[in-house]
Amino acid sequence: VHVVAGDITKIGCDAWLLPTDGAFTISGAFAEEIGLESGQRLANQVWDGSRVIRLEQSLAGRPQVWLANVGRNPGDPRNEGSWYADVIEPFARSAKEGLEPTGVPPLLAIPVLGTGDGGMAADKGTIYRELLPEMLCVAESQEVDLVLVCWGRRSLSAAQRVRRDLVAGRSLKELWDMGPKAEVLVTEAQRLGELARDRQMVLFLGAGASAGAGLPTWQRLLDDIADEAKLSQDNLEALRRLDMRDQAAILEQRLTGSTLHEVLRDRLKATEYGLTQGLLASLPSREAITTNYDTLFESAC
């Protein structure tokens, strides 16, 4: 279970949960994301007995969108935080069933339910205390990765406090499978955490940070450009033995400027940032350095 600050409609996940009510009213930025005006109702959707159903108009190549009926009336006894947490398990189960298996757990994103127009804005602590324990249980039982996407730093800090309380007394090695180097990794993680809290850490992002969002690593990008330049297999293997900067210089000579720019524009195009960018952008770091041409980290910030 991960916790980040950001925009759930922009995070690169397999599916995300969109809160609505029994009449399919969509509000705020959620409405804009699916082409509606805030407060407008979705047409051609019917609840099938479940509080979670897939949005029929999900776009190809984009994360699936699942609707959650979290609507309630004033004075409704269901206003308790558990009313909102109860949609997490059916969302995770249904979304996983609707995705093609890839060999790795799917990443499913959940907003802080009930704190916008849901009526729990004045009691967000209750929501965090209900959502996070349920997410921990569901992540394990359904074998999925879940990310709670908070809107803003204050929301993130509140969620992190609740998560710290949940895991108090448990070691990092117990919570995370770090393999045989767990001792070294835990020590280093604690050191970096202290630096981040003191705002003494500068982030350095390489191409691997963007790979999770579907962008190529530098070598894969160079291989794609070499393919566009129609290099033979022998020449490609010889090229790969060179420093990547030398590879780029040679490929630039093989392709005309416009063709090279078209290839780069096509290969470096991404609409959603990955979990890595979301986690890094959520750290209290004042500065960041990157060798990347994409703007995914900026989007996550």
Predicted regions and their residues:
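Glycine-/small-residue-enriched capping loops at alpha/beta junctions
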Residues: 1-103
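Solvent-exposed alpha-helices and their adjacent loops that cap or buttress functional pockets
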Residues: 7-11, 58-60, 102, 138-141, ...
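Conserved catalytic-core helix/loop/strand module for nucleotide-ribose chemistry
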Residues: 46-79, 171-301
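A glycine- and small-aliphatic-rich helix-loop capping segment at beta-alpha/alpha-beta transitions
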Residues: 33-37, 124-135, 166-168, 217-228
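Phosphate/ribose-phosphate-bearing ligand recognition and processing surfaces
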Residues: 72-179
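Gly/Ser/Thr-rich loops at beta-strand to alpha-helix junctions
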Residues: 22-24, 113-120, 153-155, 207-212, ...
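Short glycine-rich phosphate-binding loop at a beta-alpha junction
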Residues: 17-18, 106-112, 147, 202, ...
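Accessory terminal and edge-of-domain segments that mediate assembly/interaction
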Residues: 13, 23-41, 142-155, 160-176, ...
